[in-house]
Amino acid sequence: MRKLKVLIGGAESVFCDLRKAAREFWGFEVLEIADGKQACAALRKEHVDICILDWDLPRMTGLAACHWIRCVELKTQPYIVLLTEKGRPEQVQAAYAAGADDFLAKPFNAEDLHFLVSTFAQKISRLDLTSRELTHLDPLELYRRDLPAPKIFSRL
């Protein structure tokens, strides 16, 4: 299984710990960014599986970056987790409206974030496996498997 690439953006010490955990304990390849504009530039250049963005990123907020990511045509759309100081209902609604896949309020438990990310990683792994299976099947076999045999042929 390939290493997932995670883009992490935030300046607080919690993000330093998060980057270290993502590299050392969770086994991800980590891209570090300092602001929302850097996040957008990195996503234009590189395939990223997961974006973990602080709501309060400088130059472009995590919310604005999330909206940009969903509006721009990228090769693949990453799974986006927005993190914020306050988990007010209007912030949660704004995050999901901007295209976030998940939302966590700070202070958050690293285990909660790891659960979100590892669940997504498992889904990616299953999709990769299904994709490999489908690419190795004979197209006629797919046709035969998915379509019922016509009645005229079933009597033969």
List the predicted regions and their residue ranges:
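Short amphipathic alpha-helix used as the core "switch/output" element in two-component signaling
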Residues: A41, L63-T76
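C-terminal output helix
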Residues: E90, F108-V117
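Alpha4 helix (beta4-alpha4-beta5 surface) of REC/receiver domains from two-component response regulators
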Residues: K20, A64, G87-D102
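Active-site beta3 strand of CheY-like receiver
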Residues: H47-L53, L57
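Two-component/phosphorelay signaling modules centered on CheY-like receiver
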Residues: S13-L31
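Acidic catalytic/metal-coordinating carboxylates
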Residues: L4, D35, T61-A64
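CheY-like receiver
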Residues: Q122-L156
